[in-house]
């Protein structure tokens, strides 16, 4: 299977970039808090005649034993039933949904978890997927829910292409560690071996390139979820990175020196270069960010990169309310 995509075509809206008009698919995190942003962007692009762009979202309800990474977005009053209805609402709007079950340490003894199985059953629809960190869980889902797309989580941080070739029969899509974003020859080889539609690249990883605790951090979060140690989980997800890296920032003499600390966030030009290479699937993380930052990242990587910022402003502020103002004027 491959990532859902919308066939490309000529855009009726003019763009200011020479970027190839090839299809691109965006897997956008923070689905619980980002509903308005993603659905509005999809609707606007469609009405403006901008073809070739499709969306999937990902997130997970809190308190899931199979969870890993940092997808747990607690929303006041949310239950697993309301989360499942959110998935259904995205699907109704033509946006597929990836559940996040990326725990790295799932074993056979954990597969009977009622809460996680309930979520798999309730969200089981064509086009939806599961982001997985355990091969044991991946085989379990493949056997019992064969229509789910299986997305291999980047939390393993495997940089050797052979690892992905060895597991090509189990997963539909591989989310690659951000280190590989800069290795064009490796990406080209993987495109030739696996196909571009099976590779997904994260564009806005804010983790520092030289971070020495990255893997340990993800391992501990997986263990906290598996052991229902929610006090540890809160400690690992609330200001953990800020505390771990505080010393390097206190050593900076001026705010402008922040630019010297490199992370893995890509520029618009780097995204264009990856598209030229053949990459068509991109991941936009939105973990633990306010709605304002969520919108900024979507604007930067999608709307502004396509040269549509002014068009979208006019669309939102003039075209959409036109009937209302015309009615008041009459």
Which role does the model predict for each range below?
Residues 8-162, 170-330:
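Active-site pocket-lining/capping segments in soluble small-molecule metabolic enzymes
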